[in-house]
Regions:
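Short secondary-structure boundary elements
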Residues: 38-43, 51, 119, 170-372, ...
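Alpha-helical sensor/transducer elements of the RecA-like P-loop NTPase core
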Residues: 47, 75, 123-189, 193, ...
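Amphipathic alpha-helical segments of tetratricopeptide repeats
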Residues: 278, 367-371, 403-408, 437-444, ...
Length: 891
């Protein structure tokens, strides 16, 4: 099979291309302009200019500057014009604009591109500056690409576009263009290794054989061109300078200058730091801490040392560093052959770090220990534990890339538990169920209590995702019994056990359980897990302020070496808090952060929860396309676990509700009514779907079903004394009373709902209850009472930025007629209700949709419509829409 290698092209720069092409398109109106594109060498500035030129017509004028031509006046202009420029820069400017205009239309946008503009000769830059000043009306955009800005470039270009390294998706696309299809985890490794530099990534893709791209734990070298540059730079350095460079390379990014100086044997390293900076190898920070110009420079320096000298340096470095993990990793790097004693020492350290919750460190240490282990059984066990720690750290992509390796090993309870763990994070409930059952069946809890406890903790997470509270508590207690309360498995189980209690409706016990867990865990990476669980509980328990305080502190997985998965849960529930308390913009920003973690980690379990909040936020704003997009994103792969399925269904149901398609609401949410016994889906405090379903039943006139459906949910919420759940259900019950014409029932129920919400910062729930109350009173004919509530609801919606519901409240107010000035309704005397119906029908809504939004029957809408036709002299909805579209004459 022949693989065609394509030129890398302009990959991953769509945003920059859109920005530049839009600026070019504005030049006929705004006049000439210049933009400076800045980026480090190798980031693709040239490719960006080439991609921009490919998108425009007529052809752009292009030039590239060179350092050797800086002293040659007009060298860049000569390329742009295709001939020698005039000797005067002002005259040259006029020629440049005329050449750019060509023979086309005078107002057609023209493009001038100069690459490496920081190396351009002064004469050419003067001519470009004069062209922009003297021909301000010309539709010309000059794009100057440079590695660094200069005063003159800054004077020419008012705006700057900075380009950074490519993201993982773009690097993966680059790989495909070079004939390589990388696993997402390997693309992540390559992106991190090269800092997203297209030049360096392409070089490695071309230089390394296919086998090197098979596993994400492979050690990638520096590209040949970087090694050559570094070797040349080191050749010009003195012995002490080189010694410091090698020490920095051996010790890694987190070493202090003092440690590097000690390893290099230097008493005063600052002269060496200056020399390395002058050679272009390092940059100096304010605290005199040298930092490699790019990460690949350090890799290249290490390669110049050779295996023997590098191993000796690592051996010495083990005595210089001051933490046990760094010491162990240096000893491993100094040991090329199996070493049972060192392997055991590293494995014990890995277990300790895992027990403390530092899973990423534990994963690396277990992998090192496996390499040093000669016994195949123990070697495989340590490799499996490395993958388990990767999953615990939230590195789903890295773990997934190693699945073929793990599956090739002999079956053990640990192996099956690890594969189940990864399946849970990927949202594969059936696979996880099968693997967990198999692991539990073959483990001997008497001989391997620690392994049995680990399997039990995976059952805990599985039960959490299935929303089975009692089952979760049972498995958590089993894990604690097997391994002990203070063991890693015990702490992990305790960190989730409180959520199981909450899902079973035992909120007081849940709070007590978390208070105890927080006291036991102290200050370690495990704190992240307990704090997140406690914040999650606070969200469910109507304590949003407490939830925000806790969740905001655990959204960064780098703190204390915590887990990406835990950070994603924290972000998802923090976004929920922000939405409920009226911070829509903050909620969308938090969702975006969660999406980014989901992309890099490969964890699918939390995505629907994030997208549910995004969907509701977009709906409030009337952003239908965005709401539909995020609802679809929530649905992707959300069929396995309830914790994925319920948010996806709620997102779709709320879109249908906003469209007044209550039949669709019932169809979407109907599967949730079939929840088995023991499921948290029957807990109104956990998932707010019951009130939406009941309200849809009422809207469809199925009052007896609505009553029967609401009763057990109301009883449950009342028994648990859960305020917001009772208020939400009371909203549906109030609508039910309204549909039956029971005005006293409407008032009593809605007043009780507002009383329950009093003192809670749940602005979204208060707005919904107030709006529904006003609708019910307006339908009951209590227009003046309804006006006060609807006005309040409108203001509440406005404070939430909910433009769609502000409009709905305004329609309700107009339909009520209280605010309509009598005797000033225009030449045709439509009632306020008729005006509202006419407006909505003219906008394209069906009778059923109008009825749902105005809380009347479709027959009532048709009655109003018949009177409207007669008064306006039209015969159809089409004629009514055409009349509405006619311009209104000013008096």
């Amino acid at each position: 099979m022949t693989v065609l290698i394509e030129r890398a092209g302009c990959v991953g720069r769509e945003d920059e291309l859109v920005e530049l092409t839009s600026r070019l398109a504005r030049t006929p109106a705004s006049g000439s302009a210049a933009v400076l594109v800045l980026g480090d060498p190798g980031l693709g500035k040239t490719a960006l200019l080439r991609g921009l030129a490919d998108r425009v017509a007529p052809p752009a004028l292009t030039a590239g500057a060179g350092a050797w031509e800086q002293d040659c006046p007009g060298s860049v202009l000569r390329q742009l014009l295709g001939e020698d420029p005039p000797d005067d820069p002002v005259a040259a400017a006029d020629v440049l604009v005329a050449r750019a205009a060509g023979e086309g239309s005078a107002d057609e946008p023209r493009l001038v591109l100069v690459d490496d503009a920081d190396l351009a000769d002064t004469f050419s830059l003067q001519a470009i500056a004069s062209a922009l000043r003297r021909h301000r009306e010309a539709p010309v955009l000059v794009v100057l690409a440079a590695t660094r800005s200069t005063p003159f470039l800054g004077e020419i270009a008012a705006d700057t576009v900075r380009i950074e390294g490519l993201d993982v998706a773009a690097v993966g696309e680059l790989a495909v263009l070079r004939g390589r299809v990388l696993h997402p985890a390997m693309a992540e490794v390559l992106t991190r290794h090269t800092a997203g530099s297209p030049r360096d990534a392409v070089a490695l893709l071309d230089e390394l054989p296919p086998a090197r791209w098979a596993r994400p734990d492979t050690q990638l070298p520096a590209p040949a061109h970087v090694r050559d540059e570094v070797q040349l730079a080191l050749a010009g350095c003195g012995p002490e300078d080189r010694a410091l460079a090698e020490a920095l390379a051996v010790l890694g990014d987190h070493a202090s200058l003092g440690q590097a100086a000690a390893l290099a044997g230097l008493e005063d390293p600052l002269s060496a730091v200056d020399a390395l900076a002058a050679a272009g190898l390092v940059e100096i920070t304010r605290d005199h801490r040298p930092r490699w110009r790019t990460p690949l420079v350090g890799v290249a320096v290490l390669a110049t040392m050779g295996a023997r000298r590098a191993a000796d340096a690592h051996q010495r470095a083990a005595a210089v560093v001051d933490d046990e993990v760094s010491r162990a990793r240096h000893l491993v790097a100094a040991t090329p052959l199996p070493d049972a004693e060192l392997a055991d020492e590293v494995a014990r350290l890995a277990q300790r770090r895992g027990d403390e919750g530092a899973w990423a460190e534990a994963a690396a240490l277990y992998r090192d220990s496996s390499r040093l282990t000669e016994d195949p059984v123990r070697r495989d066990d340590r490799l499996i534990r490395s993958v388990d720690a990767l999953v615990a750290a939230g590195d789903g992509m890295g773990a997934a890339a190693l699945v073929p390796v793990v599956e090739s090993l002999r079956e053990t309870p640990l192996r099956d538990a690890v594969l189940a763990y990864l399946a849970i994070l990927r949202g594969r409930a059936s696979e996880a169920e099968v693997r967990l059952e198999r692991a539990w069946d073959i483990v001997n809890a008497d001989r391997e209590p620690e392994t049995a406890a680990l399997i039990a903790t995976r059952h805990v997470l599985h039960s959490l995702a299935l929303c089975r509270g009692d089952e979760l508590v049972t498995w958590a207690d089993r894990a604690i019994s097997l391994a002990g309360r203070d063991s890693a498995a015990g702490v992990e189980a305790a960190a989730i056990r409180g959520l199981g209690l909450a899902m079973a409706g035992r909120f007081e016990e849940a709070h007590d359980a978390y208070a105890l867990a927080a006291r036991r865990v102290g200050h370690s990476a495990q704190t992240q897990r307990v704090t997140m669980g406690r914040g999650w509980l606070d969200v469910l328990a109507d304590e949003p302020d407490e939830a925000r305080s806790r969740l905001e502190g655990v959204t960064d997985p780098r703190i204390l070496g915590g887990s990406t998965r835990i950070a994603m849960w924290a972000l998802a529930w923090l976004a929920r808090v922000q939405f409920l308390t009226g911070e829509g913009e903050a909620a969308l920003q938090t969702v975006a952060a969660g999406r980014a973690l989901a992309t890099t980690s490969g964890i699918a379990l939390v995505t629907p929860l994030l997208e549910w909040t995004a969907t509701e936020t977009h709906l409030l704003r009337g952003s239908w396309e965005e709401a539909t997009r995020t609802a679809r994103a929530a649905e992707v792969g959300a069929q396995g676990y309830e914790i994925m399925r319920v948010p996806a269904l709620l997102a779709r149901a709320h879109i249908a509700e906003a469209r007044s398609d209550f039949r669709a609401v019932l169809r979407i949410l109907e599967p949730l009514t079939q929840a088995p016994a023991g499921s948290a889906l029957s807990e109104p405090a956990i998932w707010p779907w019951a009130e939406t379903y009941a309200a849809a039943l009422v809207a469809e006139g199925r009052l007896e079903e609505a009553d029967e459906f609401l009763r057990p949910h109301e009883t449950r919420a009342r028994e648990e004394q859960h305020r917001s759940a009772q208020a939400r259900l009371a909203t549906a019950r109030g609508r039910w009373h309204g549909a039956r014409g029971d005005l006293d029932g409407v008032r009593d129920t809605f007043d009780r709902a507002l009383e329950l919400l009093d003192g809670l910062p749940l602005r979204y729930d208060r707005a919904r209850v107030t709006f529904a109350y006003g609708q019910a009173l307006r339908r009951a004919g209590r227009r003046r009472d309804a006006e006060a509530l609807l006005s309040s609801a409108r203001d509440l919606w406005d404070g939430l930025g909910a433009s769609m519901y502000v409009d709905a409240a305004e329609r309700e107010l107009r339909a009520g007629g209280v605010r309509a000035p009598r005797g000033h309704r225009g030449p045709v005397d439509l009632t306020p209700q008729e005006e509202t119906v006419a407006e909505m029908v003219a906008s394209g809504l069906s009778n059923r949709e109008v009825a749902a939004q105005l809380f009347v029957s479709p027959k009532t809408v048709q009655y109003h419509l018949t009177r409207i036709y007669a008064k306006l002299g039209v015969r159809s909805r089409t004629e009514l829409a055409a009349m509405a579209a006619e311009p209104t004459e000013e008096p």
